[in-house]
Amino acid sequence: MNWITNYVRPKINSMLGRREVPENLWIKCPETGEMVFHRDLEENKWVIPQSGFHMKMPAKARLKDLFDGGIYEAFPQPKVAQDPLKFRDSKKYSDRLRDSRTKTELEDTIVAGLGQVQGIKLVAVAHEFNFIGGSLGIAAGEAIVKAFERAIAEKCPLVMFPASGGARMQEGILSLMQLPRTTVAVNMLKEAGLPYIVVLTNPTTGGVTASYAMLGDVHLAEPGAEIGFAGKRVIEQTLREKLPEGFQTSEYLMEHGMVDMVVKRHDIPETLARVLNILMKKPAKAIKRDTATELAPLPVAASA
């Protein structure tokens, strides 16, 4: 009976055994609990079809979706010092970098490129949140500065898509130094007379909010994005007060004058083109008019 127990039974078990299902095959909506097949979610620009909830979008996918035909020149990642402080908390920083690179297939959190959006040449920069929370470190800071320099050289606008928890703590003061560096880069672009547009995504917090994320000429934001410096829980524990409903969301910030427009992800390319045409003083015929959203004429008051 050995041949049955040693060969036949394991063979049958392997044939009838449970097949392994790949991870993240189905994505759950954090708002409604709706389950969405990952390919359907990707085709819908990482927006839940029924609820309209905007999931975090991979940086490469964001640039591909933004540029005309998905075609753009990807900028190389600048070479910088790796783990200069030899930092370690519960895990070595070098190990965190290695794991994030394996997970995202990126060298660091910034993805940048040059292309066209509805015929307008521009440089776009996006954070990859899955790379150590999209945190700002030496490599990210250098990539952002290089992107601004390229925009100035090309004499074209720059569009920023921040998605970050803030400065990268594993790099200490070297990370904090990227705040003034990126701020100087923003000023250089503005001195060159070129537009700088920021599209705030979920989440935009910490040192990124305290620097280049809030220095745009125009600030757009995706629906429901968390935008702020310190987290809501930290503020409540410090002030010992309950914060208003919707505090630090893009809609709340627009109501209080911190954001110019809340724009759905599907409408971002067209909205950017319209805004840039205005900022770059293009002829009126170059601006696509949306008659469905035009304001109705004001009523004329009746004469006394």
Curated annotation (Swiss-Prot):
InterPro entries: AcCoA_carboxyl_beta, Acetyl_CoA_COase_Trfase_b_su, ClpP/crotonase-like_dom_sf, COA_CT_N
GO (cellular component) term, any one: acetate CoA-transferase complex
Location within or outside the cell: Cytoplasm
Keyword Heme annotated: no
Domain of life: Bacteria
Reactions catalysed according to its record: N(6)-carboxybiotinyl-L-lysyl-[protein] + acetyl-CoA = N(6)-biotinyl-L-lysyl-[protein] + malonyl-CoA
Pathway assigned in UniProt: Lipid metabolism; malonyl-CoA biosynthesis; malonyl-CoA from acetyl-CoA: step 1/1
CoA carboxyltransferase N-terminal domain: residues covered: 25-294
EC number(s) recorded for this UniProt protein: 2.1.3.15
GO biological processes: fatty acid biosynthetic process; malonyl-CoA biosynthetic process
GO molecular function: acetyl-CoA carboxylase activity; ATP binding; carboxyl- or carbamoyltransferase activity
Keywords carried by this UniProt record: ATP-binding, Cytoplasm, Fatty acid biosynthesis, Fatty acid metabolism, Lipid biosynthesis, Lipid metabolism, Nucleotide-binding, Transferase
Function: Component of the acetyl coenzyme A carboxylase (ACC) complex. Biotin carboxylase (BC) catalyzes the carboxylation of biotin on its carrier protein (BCCP) and then the CO(2) group is transferred by the transcarboxylase to acetyl-CoA to form malonyl-CoA.
Entry similarity comment: Belongs to the AccD/PCCB family.
Subunit structure: Acetyl-CoA carboxylase is a heterohexamer composed of biotin carboxyl carrier protein (AccB), biotin carboxylase (AccC) and two subunits each of ACCase subunit alpha (AccA) and ACCase subunit beta (AccD).
NCBIfam families: accD
HAMAP family, alphabetized: AcetylCoA_CT_beta (MF_01395)
Official protein name in the record: Acetyl-coenzyme A carboxylase carboxyl transferase subunit beta
Organism field: Sinorhizobium medicae (strain WSM419) (Ensifer medicae)
